[in-house]
């Protein structure tokens, strides 16, 4: 029996969660992806397959404020930015999709910052 890689296990967890979690126009899905260097967050309406708001550490607007910060601090900045952008579009309540990642560290920091920014999970 072949050993599964951590990426395969994460994708398997993500598929299992996605069977049950779906974004609607009233309560879209806040989807998070974490790479070794960056973190990305999108607010998605799954009924039409449209991204309503997005924020990441690769954006030029956020990059200036991220210099010299740790990855967890960067996740907090992205969480605050996604909350601000979602509220600007009129979104108050979301379903959190952690993307198969553990709810710990950078994922938790992003979620907490989004909650502090006014999003309800």
UniProtKB/Swiss-Prot annotation:
Molecular function terms, GO-annotated: 5S rRNA binding; structural constituent of ribosome
InterPro entries assigned: Ribosomal_uL18_bac-type, Ribosomal_uL18_bac/euk
UniProt record, GO biological process: translation
Coiled-coil intervals: none
Domain of life: Bacteria
GO terms for cellular component: cytosolic large ribosomal subunit
Keywords: Ribonucleoprotein, Ribosomal protein, RNA-binding, rRNA-binding
Subunit-structure text: Part of the 50S ribosomal subunit; part of the 5S rRNA/L5/L18/L25 subcomplex. Contacts the 5S and 23S rRNAs.
HAMAP family linked: Ribosomal_uL18_B (MF_01337_B)
Protein purpose: This is one of the proteins that bind and probably mediate the attachment of the 5S RNA into the large ribosomal subunit, where it forms part of the central protuberance.
Name used for this protein in its record: Large ribosomal subunit protein uL18
Source organism of this protein record: Roseiflexus castenholzii (strain DSM 13941 / HLO8)
Gene from which the chain derives: rplR
């Amino acid at each position: 029996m072949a050993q599964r890689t951590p990426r395969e296990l994460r994708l398997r967890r993500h598929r299992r969660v996605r069977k049950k979690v779906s974004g609607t126009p009233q309560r879209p899905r806040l989807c998070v992806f974490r790479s070794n260097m960056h973190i990305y967050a999108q607010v998605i309406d799954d009924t039409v397959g449209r991204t309503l708001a997005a924020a990441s550490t690769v954006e030029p607007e956020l990059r200036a404020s991220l210099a010299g910060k740790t990855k967890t601090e960067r996740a907090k900045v992205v969480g605050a930015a996604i909350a601000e952008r979602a509220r600007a579009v009129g979104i108050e309540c979301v379903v959190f999709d952690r993307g198969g990642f553990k709810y710990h560290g950078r994922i938790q920091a992003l979620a907490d910052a989004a909650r502090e920014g006014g999003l309800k999970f």
